[in-house]
């Protein structure tokens, strides 16, 4: 590939036979596309070809760098569009006039079945000239729609491509007032070649020209067509929460109402004083039933009980509990020693004291000795049961507590305690009392026999 200067020189030179032959050959071979596509003459210069050509000056090197950045940006924008869904601005549709629309042809989005072949040079139009490439043509003297080309809607017509409209030649004054070049959108008669750099919709693929950028102008004539999208590629709108003011939002404060973050000691002291004064004022204005002011102190007995703080009810309760404890202690203190044994021991001591008080000599008619001998009951006495029953009735008449007793024979024990009156006569003991009595009887019998033997042999 030749450089840009050589290409322009060749392009501006008069037509030759070789050029006509080459042109006819191209027209004969190009039979695949069904329509006509209008592009700039230098659009077929690809980026890959620009890498291999000879770089003549710094300006051309800068232009190549711009092309590389444009291709890289197109790839990034394509991937970015696939990642995020665009949020379009609300569309306001205005009524359109019945007259035909003479605005420039709109571009259409590329179809999914587009041709991925490399770019081809466009056919020569009847009204084309051999002048250098120009930016896209907009009529400066037209009173029709001068709005930028629109994007194709999803519900647009999917009919076969139609031949493009003819674009008239512009005047030099209109070209001088133009804004920087924009990327051209795909036309109805465009081929399905790979997508080009679409950073600017109405620009061609040639290196950008150095031209002073002029501000966008608005036409005075009213445009009744629907609103179009911006010429620049709009990035997807990210809906974010509006960040509230950190000074007025509670997120910048602690649970106590103080400000968080890095502060000086003076600010902390002032804020603490203000908060303390605010709380004191709020407590003073609060009702006594809510705040608990002037209320009597209630002490918990188990946790906060102290000496000298008992009430009258507590003192009376304490006295009752002490008295009952002494009674139970007096009643059960001898249960581990045997109640019957203690009573017998007490009666024996009283009898010993009485005998000690009697005179040394005792006569036959001693009344105390005779009464004692009458009260003693013997097992062999036939009158023993009658006397025992008489004594029982006498005790009941005196109002004494008399328990019923068992009437019948039972195995004797070392304490001489009779079984209860409800006993059924079955011995349920472990035999300890019987063994103990047998051992005691054997010992007594052996002693008696030993004593008799000694008396006989002496």
From Swiss-Prot:
Cross-referenced InterPro entries: Bud13, CWC26_splicing_factor
An individual GO BP term: mRNA splicing, via spliceosome
Compositional bias annotation for Basic residues: 175-185, 208-218
Region spans: Disordered: 16-37, 81-328, 437-458
Gene Ontology CC: U2-type spliceosomal complex
Keyword line: Coiled coil
Pfam families: Bud13
Record keyword Cytoplasm present: no
Biased composition (Basic and acidic residues): 138-148, 219-243, 266-284, 314-328
Family from the record: Belongs to the CWC26 family.
Protein name in UniProt: BUD13 homolog
Annotated source species: Caenorhabditis elegans
